[in-house]
Amino acid sequence: LLRLTTIRRFQEAHSLSNAARTAVVAWLMTAVYYFYQYTMRSAPAVMMPQLSDAFGLTTMAVASMVGLFYYGYSPFSLVAGVAMDRLGPRKVVPLGAATMGVGALMFATGDNQVASFGRFLQGAGGVFALVGAAYIAMTHFPASRAATLIGATQMFGMAGGSAGQFVVGPIIASGVSWNTFWAGMGIVGLAISALLFVLLPPPKPKPAEADGAWLKTAGRTMLLVFRNPQSILCGMIAGLLFIPTTIFDMIWGVRYLQEARGFDYATAVIRSSTVPFGWIIGCPLLGFVSDRVGRRKPVIAAGAVVLLLCLAWILYGPTDVLPPYVVGLVAGIASGAAMLPYTVIKEANPPEASGTATGVVNFLNFTFSALLGPVFGWILVSVSGGAARMSLEHYQTAFEPLLYGVGLALLLTLFLKETGPAVRRPAPLAAHEGL
């Protein structure tokens, strides 16, 4: 009997080991997909003149075309969240990567309408990367590691964002044509899709539902998440902390540094890429700190304060006082706090709504980028009178509202309910009340 028990325990341990290994591989591959998605998201910033010439559009019109990414990304966040809860990652994440690959190939055609729809598809397919990685992290790993793993996921994403500027910039400058780059990225996307299909584990079997019942269940789950005020707060805080990167740095950063600060192209690309590089450090670091102290709100608030100071310095401070690249790097590190609402919304909603919760916060987050991107561009054109080259004052006037947005995020954090492990652990006395 003892021998049988020992064998059974060994088999259970071996099974758990295999399951853990499968989960790690699945999360890692989905994080690589997120790296790829962010590379494609940020790459247009370093080739705006080439895109403007190729499409025969003004820089502002190209910025609007590039912004179509968020018009696909934001609404499909809800689709991705529901699909993840319903079907599991293996059935939907590879499809998202394939959609991104096709979108890149369409963008490479150089036809305005085809490229615009291709950019939209890149956003629609790209949303499955973060939602899939976060779903795997929350359902296959201990809750005490949630913020760390989601932060690590965003680390991969921002590594791609940094590569989209720091690596792609020199590639384009070396003479590689913009459409060759996009065609190559399309092929990479299709390859990632195939790997995801092979490496992601099959979904766990679920009880059969009557025809149409799953749609009602999905609707109830989404309504449950949207009705939770904490969900709305999470989306607003994340969105307000994200837009300094998604709108200012990733679309206008290089041009701002060239026109307003007088840097050459190569230096502007490197300086701009320090922000997403800072995210690489900040996302896992702040996630780890939050898990370590067992609280979310203080870390979000601290990150918002530091980001506010850095953003004010980037817009109004001199460029020759602090060491090069420091302010952008610190701004990126502080921006990592924007990922903590992704953990909070999951902790503030039922476990069975995990995927939907991620979809909702992603939808609210990037709705800010989708709606406000053209607004900031319009303000910049208005204050400059449509000038071909903008001045420092033009950029300061156009992007000063970003400071108010980060300040609002800090204020909203005060109303956020603390959901960290420290408040979810039973108090020592309460744990012994029944003794």
Residue ranges and their predicted role:
Residues P75-Q113:
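Conserved MFS/SLC helix-loop-helix module at the cytosolic interface between two early adjacent transmembrane helices
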Residues V25-T59, F248-V254, L372-F376:
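Extracytoplasmic
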Residues N112, T153-P202:
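Helix-loop-helix hairpin linking two adjacent transmembrane segments in secondary transporters
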Residues R9-A19, P203-G235, L429-L435:
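Juxtamembrane intracellular "pre-TM" segments in multi-pass secondary transporters
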Residues G118-G157:
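Cytoplasmic helix-loop-helix junction between adjacent transmembrane helices
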Residues F76-G88, G282-R295:
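Helix-to-loop junctions at the C-terminal end of transmembrane segments
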